[in-house]
């Protein structure tokens, strides 16, 4: 696989506390919060005790949370099939995290037969709800032509949407596409900028790619990139535009 990567397995299953509290059903919000408090304290058995009844009663956030517990083997025996079952119940109710997680399970054949087309279907549903992780994952499927027709334009489109939300792997993937001129004109200034955003948040592959490009840029070009980068971050990654053509654009 090229540097255009999906995020590491564990990142999909990190709990986003604010989102989970907002999505919790009003009638079960207090119990959901108790489960979340127990989870954060490392008392996974107590989290199961609070979340499982909610999940069985149809709470989509609790269903997704039970899927996470089964996926990671926290408070319950690790069981991908059970994780898949809970994610599917959550996703079918329109829960964005459940949809993204279900896409992941289909993509990697976890608890279910691998099916890229179904992975794309569920990633698309989550992506359409604005989930940056799912947007990047859908972009990767388009990039590689897995479950969808290979389309660099669609890959770039979804990477851009994900990048606008600060999704660091999307930043890395945009860097790759600018470096290699895939769908967009090759532009090492833009590639350097996007790699730098990802590298500054800990992606070593992005750091290596950035540093390699850096050896080919002049001092003035590096200053230009710094200005572009500040503007991009100041716009919360939503309007980063294209850089002027560098000596290495064509």
Report the location of each language-model feature:
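N-terminal secretory signal peptides that target proteins for export/translocation
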Residues: 1-11
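Short helix-capping/linker turns of helical repeat alpha-solenoids
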Residues: 42, 56-59, 72-74, 79, ...
């Amino acid at each position: 696989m090229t540097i255009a990567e999906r995020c590491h397995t564990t990142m999909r299953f990190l709990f986003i506390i604010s989102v989970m509290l907002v999505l919790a059903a009003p009638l079960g919000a207090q119990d959901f919060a108790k489960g979340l408090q127990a989870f954060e304290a490392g008392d996974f058995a107590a989290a199961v005790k609070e979340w499982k009844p909610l999940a069985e009663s149809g709470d989509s956030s609790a269903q997704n949370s039970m899927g996470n517990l089964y996926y990671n083997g926290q408070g319950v025996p690790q069981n991908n099939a059970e994780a898949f079952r809970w994610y599917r119940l959550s996703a079918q109710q329109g829960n964005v995290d459940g949809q993204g997680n279900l896409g992941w399970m289909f993509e990697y054949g976890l608890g279910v037969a691998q099916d890229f087309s179904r992975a794309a279907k569920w990633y698309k549903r989550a992506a359409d709800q604005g989930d940056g992780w799912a947007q990047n994952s859908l972009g990767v499927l388009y990039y590689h032509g897995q479950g969808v027709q290979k389309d660099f334009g669609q890959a770039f489109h979804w990477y851009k949407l994900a990048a606008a939300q600060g999704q660091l792997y999307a930043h890395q993937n945009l860097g790759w596409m600018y470096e290699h001129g895939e769908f967009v004109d090759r532009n090492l200034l833009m590639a350097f900028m996007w790699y730098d955003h990802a590298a500054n948040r800990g992606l070593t592959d992005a750091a290596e790619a950035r540093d390699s490009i850096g050896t080919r840029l002049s001092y003035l070009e590096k200053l230009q990139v710094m200005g572009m980068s500040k503007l991009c971050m100041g716009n919360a990654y939503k309007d980063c535009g294209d850089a002027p053509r560098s000596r290495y654009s064509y």
